[in-house]
Every structure is written in structure tokens, then in C-alpha cells.
């Protein structure tokens, strides 16, 4: 079994991943694989490979395993959240958003091993907000999703007794062990996305609280990390 699979998902080349994630110089390691789920495979191919010039890593391109009929974001979220359903035969997975470039460091030694020694789940700590109630207000202000849907979601959590100021993650990177406990976490997380907003940061902390699952904090944040370089959507690095 592969030790670690780093993976992502892109639809309609939304993140322009050939200039971001796929162009990563990266760091080749035994036991670490790289997988991208995409709808851009030619002629219904079951798989392909991609290696950028100057890169140390090779990406395995796989077709999407599920597609929402109307919302490409929910299509991507399915692959992001359901790591246990993607035929990722590995001890651990690391989800990375398509807006990130992998820096030339050992993800196994510097990211995964320290986390795996203590946690089955980890993500970035949000750099600006400290709970899902604040996140919902920010998402409403920025018109990130249907405001009624988000309000109903947060009200449901409040009715259950979910506390304020209970932490907030930034899910540009999500580390997970491939365990039954994490499969249960994924299932409940996806259930929230299916019922409510596709903004997965609104439900991650609720699900961890509901399942009494302690999660770790990945050092840094989406835009400032020792592991990744952030490239805004639609832009490429110099």
C-alpha cells in the first residue's frame, strides 16, 4: 500500500491547474503518489499521467467519480470530502486545493509524519475568523452561497447546542488517515454539504464536534504556508 496520496479535483479547468498545482516543482519520495480527479481526460480515457517540465513529481489523472448536474463546486466537494470512496489505496491522504503549488520539500517528513503521530485529521486554522457563526456572516456578506440555505444550516447547529467560538478551519489542505473513524467523519461532512451549503468550512467544525473528533492544525494558512505557494484563481506565478 502507498503511504501517502496527495490529491485534488478540478472541473472545467476552474483553477487553471496547469499553471498552479500541476506545475509544482515538488519533491519526489518513495511511498508518495499524486492524483488529480478531472473532467478533462480525452475521449473518455480511464487515466493519464502529467509531469510538468522541471517538476520532480508525476500526477496520475483520473476521471471524476461523481458529478452534480448543476453545480461544479459540489462536484469538486464530493471528491474533496469523500476520501474513503475514491479508491485511494494509501495510509493517509492530503487534499490540496487547485490554487496551491507544492513547494520542493518532503511532505512525508515535514507535514504528514508530525501530524500522523498525533491526529487522524488536520487542516489549516482560519487566519481571520474563529467560529462557523462568524464564517456564515462573512459568507453572506461576500455572497458565497444562498443566504437562506446558510442561515438554516447555522440555525440547525445552534438548535443542537453547537457552541460559538469553537474554532474554524481553512480547508485548502486537509490531512486524513484512511480509517473507519475518518470514513464516518467524511460521511457526516458530506451529508451536511448535500443538505445545506457547499461551503465546507461551515460544517467541518460542527462534524468534528458532533463526533467528538479532535483534529490537528496544519502550520500556516492557505495564503502563507511552508508547504504550499498560493496562486489566486485565474493567475499564474511569475
Protein language model features and the residues they cover:
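Short, high-confidence coil segments that cap the C-terminus of an alpha-helix
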Residues: 90, 117-120, 213
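Catalytic core and acceptor-binding pocket of nucleotide-sugar-dependent glycosyltransferases
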Residues: 144-238
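A conserved donor-nucleotide-binding helix/loop in the catalytic core
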Residues: 67-96, 107-108, 203
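N-terminal anchoring/stem segment of glycosyltransferases
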Residues: 1-76, 86-89, 195-198, 210-212, ...
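Cell wall/extracellular polymer interaction/catalysis modules
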Residues: 96, 129-143, 147-148, 227
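Conserved donor-nucleotide/metal-binding helix-loop-beta segment in metal-dependent transferases, i.e.
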Residues: 102-140
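The conserved acidic donor/metal-binding loop of glycosyltransferases
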Residues: 97-101
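Nuclease catalytic cores that cleave nucleic-acid phosphodiester bonds
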Residues: 60, 88, 103, 128-129, ...
Amino acid at each position: 500500500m502507498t503511504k501517502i496520496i496527495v490529491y485534488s479535483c478540478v472541473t472545467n479547468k476552474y483553477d487553471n491547474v496547469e499553471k498552479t498545482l500541476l506545475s509544482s516543482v515538488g519533491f519526489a519520495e518513495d511511498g508518495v503518489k499524486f492524483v488529480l480527479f478531472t473532467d478533462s481526460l480525452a475521449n473518455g480515457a480511464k487515466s493519464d499521467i502529467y509531469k510538468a517540465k522541471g517538476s520532480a513529481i508525476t500526477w496520475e489523472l483520473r476521471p471524476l467519480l461523481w458529478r452534480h448536474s448543476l453545480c461544479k463546486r459540489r462536484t469538486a466537494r464530493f471528491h474533496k470530502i469523500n476520501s474513503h470512496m475514491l479508491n485511494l489505496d494509501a495510509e493517509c491522504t492530503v487534499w490540496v486545493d487547485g490554487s496551491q503549488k507544492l513547494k520542493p520539500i518532503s511532505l512525508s517528513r515535514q507535514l504528514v509524519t508530525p501530524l500522523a503521530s498525533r491526529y487522524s485529521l488536520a487542516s489549516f486554522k482560519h487566519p481571520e475568523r474563529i467560529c462557523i457563526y462568524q464564517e456564515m456572516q462573512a459568507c453572506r456578506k461576500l455572497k458565497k452561497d444562498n443566504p437562506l440555505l446558510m442561515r438554516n444550516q447555522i440555525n440547525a447547529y445552534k438548535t443542537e447546542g453547537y457552541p460559538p467560538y469553537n474554532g474554524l478551519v481553512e480547508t485548502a489542505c486537509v490531512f486524513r488517515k484512511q480509517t473507519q473513524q475518518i470514513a464516518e467523519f467524511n460521511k457526516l461532512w458530506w451529508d451536511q454539504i448535500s443538505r445545506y451549503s457547499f461551503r465546507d468550512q461551515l460544517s467541518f467544525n460542527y462534524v468534528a464536534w458532533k463526533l467528538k473528533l479532535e483534529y490537528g492544525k496544519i502550520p500556516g494558512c492557505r495564503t502563507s504556508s511552508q508547504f504550499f505557494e498560493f496562486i489566486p484563481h485565474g493567475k499564474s506565478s511569475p
